[in-house]
């Protein structure tokens, strides 16, 4: 359990929508990997309580997706506030990664960063300002090497921890089949 500045922090969140001005965070997961993408630690996944009015305001896609996964029920049952979720995630990160050393890692993580900046600014500030966004490689492979892009098997569960593991696997795929490391 030693801090290592070379560890990578992988983040995924589920939200009630895509607009931080009106939508809220409902689930957070973190995974720490080494620089070779081997899992070092996983934080407990947190369902963040939100009032019924926030859940009712979700569009049909979010209600359907988060309803099927059971997330809406877990959010209703949760007693963890956004502030408490932020404190728990920061406590976890303090064990593994020094502040402002790891980029935020994941898929389309600019979206996650927008929500963190709005609702959990201390948590967002723990990350380096850089991003390691797997979706950049996805977009490049789609255009430059479609056969590599098509080789990615994603389930798209929209469950935070499962999505992180898919993102790590996707980056491994691009590392092995798209990037020339030798």
UniProtKB/Swiss-Prot annotation:
Question: What broad class describes the main subcellular location of this protein?
Answer: cytoplasm
Would you tell me the Gene Ontology cellular component terms?
cytoplasm
Q: List the GO molecular function terms.
A: 3'-5'-RNA exonuclease activity; nucleic acid binding
The record's EC number reads 3.1.15.-
- Domain named Exonuclease is located at 8-171
Q: Which UniProt keywords apply?
A: Cytoplasm, Exonuclease, Hydrolase, Nuclease
Q: Which Gene3D superfamilies match?
A: Ribonuclease H-like superfamily/Ribonuclease H (3.30.420.10)
- Keyword check for Disulfide bond, yes or no: no
What domain of life does the native source organism fall in?
Bacteria
Location(s), subcellular: Cytoplasm
Give the residues annotated as active site.
Answer: 129
Among the GO biological process terms of this entry, one is:
DNA metabolic process
State the family it belongs to: Belongs to the oligoribonuclease family.
Q: What does this protein do?
A: 3'-to-5' exoribonuclease specific for small oligoribonucleotides.
**HAMAP family linked to this entry:** Oligoribonuclease (MF_00045)
Name of the protein this chain belongs to: Oligoribonuclease
Q: Which organism is it from?
A: Azoarcus sp. (strain BH72)
